[in-house]
Amino acid sequence: PTFVKEFRSAVEQAKTLGVSLQVILGLGDSPDFKSLIREIRNRQPPVTYWLVRGGDPSDFHAAQKQLSAIGQGSKMGVTRVTNFVDLNRARPESDLVQAVGFAINPQIHAFDHASIVESLPMHAEVVENARQFTGDRPLVIGPITMTPQLLDGNDEYGGLLRGGALPTFVDGRQVEPFTAAWTLGSLKYLADASVDSATFFETVGWNGLMDIDDVSARPQEFPSKPGSVF
């Protein structure tokens, strides 16, 4: 299965960096729990949270039943990979939900530099709103990115290419100091709101902290070189 390769890569990176993983599970119509459990037993991944994507309670309970049997000590939760609005529309009600998450990105309605910066205080506000119905359960925020990533109910990335140059889940400003400054601003407001965890971007690649080493030429709209640190 495709997810096995991605899971192995994530586990290897986490162990190399000495960090834990928060794994988002998109179950789909026929979830392959057998392959996932085999990978968990073989690789002993440092997973802190398993977060079931979407608002379907049956998906959460299916994952909780399968993963609780292996006794890894990780917490089971739910998340929305779109934004807080979708989480608020389908609030988790099960007492078995041990953690709650949602994604943050600044480009739903506006895309210019000023609007992106002006929306930073909202990062704290949505956390405070979430606390009203999540109680004392950990709030696990992420992915925090410059553009929307996965769409709930859709296993594909953002989809169409923007003007034929960049995928919709990529922003050319990822390589700019502006994004580094925006990240610091987001960290400030999320820390003020006392979130339990915040995951920004990816390790390497389009949405990473640096580009991959074996990348071919990037489009002009994404001025990066192999191994560049953003």
Question: What residues fall within each predicted segment?
Answer:
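Structural recognition of alpha->loop->beta junctions
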Residues: 38-50, 92-103, 185-197
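Aromatic-lined substrate-binding rim segments of carbohydrate-active enzymes
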Residues: 2-42, 57-74, 118-120
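Short, well-ordered coil/turn segments that N-cap beta-strands
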Residues: 15-21, 44-48, 72-75, 96-98, ...
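Noncatalytic carbohydrate-binding groove/subsite architecture in carbohydrate-active enzymes
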Residues: 53-177
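Short, acidic/polar
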Residues: 7, 30-42, 84-92, 178-188
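Structured alpha-helical segments in the cores of large, soluble enzyme domains
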Residues: 7-10, 126-132, 186-188
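Aromatic/acidic polysaccharide-binding cleft in carbohydrate-active enzymes
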Residues: 142-228
